[in-house]
Amino acid sequence: MAALPEQAGAAGTPGPYVFAEGTETVEGATSNVEGHRLSPGRSYKSTLPRAGQRFYRLELDARESAYVSVTAIPKPGTQVSYADGVEVSVQDADGGNCTPLEAEEARFGSSESPRPITATASRRVGPDEKSCAEAGTYYVVVERTRTSRSAREPQDSRESQDSQGSQGSQGYGSSEASPEDWDLEIHVASEPVLKAGDEAEGEKEPPQSWDSSTPVPPTGERRPREGGTSFSSARGLEGGVWGAEIESGQTLFYRVPVDWGQRLSATAELGSSSVDGSGGSAERGGAVRRGTARGSGYVSSALVMSLYNPVRAQVDDAHTAYDGRQKSAALEPLPPIAYENRFAPADEVATMRFAGWYYLAVHLSSGVAEKFGDGPLELTLRVDVEGDPKPGPAYAGSPRPADEFRVTERDAAAARRGETAAAGGGAGGGRDEVMAVVAAGGIGAGVVLLGILGVWTLVARRRAAAAVATEAVATEAAVAGATGVAPGAVAEHTERAEHTERFGPPRRW
């Protein structure tokens, strides 16, 4: 029997990217004919070299859409440029792409800070889908972004660009791409077609109107909740005001259950820096921070918050610069979850097509430590889920993973307790697998396994309770008094939710 799942993401500093327990390690092939088969409902670990394509294989029927997300995970300290990133496509036997775009991409953008980034491609079925609609073999193709100058330009060309300098960041392609392989997490999900006669089956248009006004962020006491380091270790959140410490270079993952008919909003706030005005050190919450005077530094795209839907397709991102004073970044207004949203031309609407767990990934640029010291900063998340749940579409089959596109009472409880998927609070949790074994193993084996399940449940609950208790007694660092803005300090500037620059080209779902 597999080991009992760990309660990842307890209070404390998150470690490296955490892959889900039982994740199979596979090697990407250099040819499509050798591609390892990927199955819907499962996650895989792989690697991606600096150059070259890697192939994987899907066997799909004609009654399910498939969504393949690829999360690229550079090692901490890796040099990345604006255009560096990962791209993924699903192709048929003739090399044709199954999505309107040539490939789906995710890039590091102007933050130029290494972190997990995710791109998602799909093969869709339905009355209006003409390509890749037949049952058969399809291929997943993954590579680093071909438009990345740091990966494809000759060295002398890069040096010529570097000599010209840049403003605000390292510049487009100004740093040489790391030669190391990147880790990959590949997640495959499937969505069945609708039952004949389902009301949503005849819908071909997105909702004509919805409240697009900017939601009012929730207020109230800030409750501590440390984030996870990956999709599988993302900590559950319900609506409210949540706080954590975030260090330069870290990415914190959270997940929020959003049901059909409900609307999600989120704002991330970064607290002020408390380094002293002499470039020395200052105490902050019992720790010593070292850096330059508050207001004398400036980091473009210092805080990046990305929202992903249940199949890990990016919905929206928001980012803000940082000059030592408190800043915030908010997602654009999003529509209520509806099956018909998939027919909308705007990605921010089209990706809000599923009920289930939505993921928030919050990253603090590695450049912040250079300007404002190496200690953590205070992060505040204001999350709200508006509206009453509505009945979802009637699928002609079961999604994979199971319960992927709905919100259960167990999900709501997991969000309240801050549980991760490994603790049994999400689709694909280990408890469902044990129950399947009990059902298939007969009475004798079932009694033994139910006893183990009881111990498992008790341990998971105690771990979750311990994590919450630890958070509850955690003291929040007092923000030091302002030392005054140095002469000539940069004026307040925020790049929040303006979308003058996205972290990757426009996607089309």
Q: Where is each model-derived feature located?
A:
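Membrane-proximal extracellular "stem/stalk" segments
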Residues: 253-434
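Non-catalytic extracellular/lumenal accessory regions of secreted precursors
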Residues: 8-54, 76, 98-112, 151-156, ...
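Noncatalytic modules at the cell exterior or secretory-pathway interfaces
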Residues: 64-66, 124-152, 262-264, 349-367
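Extended, solvent-exposed segments with strong compositional bias
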Residues: 104-126, 232-235, 241, 321-352
